[in-house]
């Protein structure tokens, strides 16, 4: 599948191992992994950042193979999941940064165009999340209040 607003195909990706059991060299218990996830979430880290930290610093390749459930499901079970999905959050953050740039550089036409593309992605993703009930049906992206969402 290609990119939305460019010509790239984006075909390179890592392969998830077929074996669903944890590797033999992972000695960490499921309860300890969940505790690490809770600590990181309370510090304010996003689920993908938590996964990277667990992989790089603690040697846990896949949380699902160790605990039986994914990081976001564990966070939801403990009430620590972010209210806005992570990919939407970072798109909103990007739009806020572009708007801030445009306040200082009003004649930057390319940034104006890129802002339109980013906001198109935000609206499309928000529509999907409303349909799948990950966002409330009354949720709406507004550029004036976007900076409060990512602050």
Curated annotation (Swiss-Prot):
Name of the protein in question: Small ribosomal subunit protein uS15z
GO molecular function (one): structural constituent of ribosome
InterPro entries membership: Ribosomal_uS15, Ribosomal_uS15_arc_euk, Ribosomal_uS15_N, uS15_NS1_RNA-bd_sf
One GO-annotated biological process of the protein: translation
Origin superkingdom: Eukaryota
Entry keyword annotation includes Nucleotide-binding: no
Family label: Belongs to the universal ribosomal protein uS15 family.
UniProt-listed NCBIfam families: PRK08561.1
The species this protein was found in: Oryza sativa subsp. japonica
Pfam families: Ribosomal_S13_N, Ribosomal_S15
GO CC terms, sorted: cytosolic small ribosomal subunit; nucleolus
SUPFAM superfamilies attached to this UniProt entry: S15/NS1 RNA-binding domain
Keywords, in A-Z order: Ribonucleoprotein, Ribosomal protein
